[in-house]
Amino acid sequence: MPRRREVPKREILPDPKFGNVELSKFMNVIMEGGKKAVAERIIYGALELIQKKHPDKDPLEAFTVAINNVKPMVEVKSRRVGGANYQVPVEVRPVRRLALSMRWLKEAARKRGEKSMAQRLANELLEATEGRGGAMKRRDEVHRMAEANKAFSHFRF
């Protein structure tokens, strides 16, 4: 954290196809080694696959629902008190909430067994809209940890 001044947030431009800022943030999360064109192809491919599988569903809406379902409300942070480390549950800030949900969706999609990354991502997003999948499992795990350590919530930061 800077001591002198607050670093200004960079403005992220909306993606070219849908004009959605969240989608372009997700594109940046998916991107590796500065290869934005590859990330773009993966994401748009996944959204097209969602459209093909469920013609009645809007793929952008499915993406938004998936992101919102995966967002964690609470997480645990380590806090040292009197020679012991406690896992203290804390509420997650909105910006971190979004970042974590995107990161978890990416990681869960990577671990899947489908052929292409677009297929993996499409299936992970569809499962997340239904409250299933690897990313949802991760969120539930984090929530369970926070629930288990509720007794230490008075050690707030």
Curated annotation (Swiss-Prot):
Q: Does the keyword S-adenosyl-L-methionine apply?
A: no
One GO biological process this protein is involved in is: translation
Pfam families noted in UniProt: Ribosomal_S7 (PF00177)
Task: List the GO terms this entry assigns under cellular component, sorted alphabetically.
Answer: small ribosomal subunit
Q: Give the keywords, sorted.
A: Ribonucleoprotein, Ribosomal protein, RNA-binding, rRNA-binding, tRNA-binding
What is a single molecular function from GO for this protein?
Answer: structural constituent of ribosome
Superkingdom of the source species: Bacteria
Q: What does this protein do?
A: One of the primary rRNA binding proteins, it binds directly to 16S rRNA where it nucleates assembly of the head domain of the 30S subunit. Is located at the subunit interface close to the decoding center, probably blocks exit of the E-site tRNA.
Q: Which family does it belong to?
A: Belongs to the universal ribosomal protein uS7 family.
Alphabetized HAMAP family for the sequence: Ribosomal_uS7_B (MF_00480_B)
Q: How does it assemble?
A: Part of the 30S ribosomal subunit. Contacts proteins S9 and S11.
Q: What is this protein called?
A: Small ribosomal subunit protein uS7
